[in-house]
Amino acid sequence: MDITKNNFAEQIDNITKNLKRSCFVGLDAEFTAILSGDGFKHRLFDTNKERYDLIKNEVSKMIMTQVGLTMFQYEREFDNYAAIGYTFHLCPQALADIDQSFIFQASTLKFLCKHNFDFNKFIYDGIPYLSRHEEKIIRQMIHDKTLNSNLIQKMEIEDEKKLQQCCSEVSRWLTSGEGETLYFDIESPVLRYIIHNEIRLRFPDVLTTDSLGNSNKVLIYRDKYVEGANSAPMAVLEDNLMNNILGFSQIINLLVEHKKPIIGHNLFLDVVLLHSQFIGPLPKYYSAFKKNVNNLFPIIFDTKYISHEMGKKLSYDELWNSNKLQDLYEFFSEGKCKKLEKGINFIKLSTPFNVKQSYHEAGWDSYCSGYCFIRLGHWAACETSGSYRPVGPKEKLAALDFYCNKINVIRGAVPYMNLVSDDPPSHRPTLLHIKSMKERMINIAKISSVIESSGSVDIKRYGNRTALIAAGTRNT
């Protein structure tokens, strides 16, 4: 189901209910940029700390434009799963001293167009959000009673005209003595907040509140003697404003509050962006970044890493084509896994998708990640018990616990990022040190051409006459 700013408020109660009922949540995201070029090339030399240090400044300029969440609910009576999928369309906002910015790479635009990304939903209908750091700034302004004046200073001309128009109309209405109430229909929650404040400031005797049944309406009573007159407490107006500007961050807060296991595929960049976009600026130290993420999201599974490790148990004839998400999903959904011939759960998706056109759509990919997790968990649980039979979600989670909080690392010195402990030691062969015996400056290009047929290797200069070679496997 597509969620935009137009239906977010009416759907948030259903989303909350479905999240609470879920046993785990699939997650996927689409970004405004990808880390490409020689400066961000994945190298076999890289430790996770080095890779984090390399990308953190660039990632801070990127945002998630779509977040897919699929809530998997276990129906014990039928031993089935109901999967409720959502695609949240996000858009940054400018508010007071906060002006969220980002980069869009041409290559990413091309990729998104190829996969039918809806830019109108992103720009016109995207849900706002705030990081926890930004939320703290706004709440401090509220506490200091400086938010309203700050918002007025940053108002666009059209909103400024609307504010003056409303205040002038209130003045004329009070002078004329006509009617006991007046109301304005104001779509923008920020402008609505400003109008409440300004009318109360300029006309101390009037009372203002949100009109019952229509939160877009500012209802004004001539004075406290009007029958039924009431004035919304400032705390209520502030809460209404915060709920609107927090937007999608309310969903992030629900994930944090309920501590549901989060399932994704190849999550390294997703996790870094989760911090940058919804927690706050990426910390200087890699260890602090891992601690922050784990404090808020204590249970994360990466099906890319799980499938890489469990795939080692399959023969060549049994193995999937690759463990890219599409290949892995089709391997399981088409019944190709010989380890899962009995007792597998039926998974019922509530949201229709055109499968062949939906990959790289965040909602669909979040479903695929959760689907693969269920199948991998069933396989692992049955392997542990020695028999293939029905397996519930708790048993699946327990069977895959070894892989919990281990985030796949592409082409690095170590296979995964450990969010709860030290990263593992390098699993690559010992580095090969070579030295030029004749030339005063070692020729890296020449070395590359000589060994390129040997397999997966990386080379880096190590002084004028020496270089280091990293191999992907001991068979290289």
Q: Which residues does each predicted region cover?
A:
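DEDD superfamily 3′-5′ metal-dependent exonuclease/proofreading module
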Residues: M1-T476
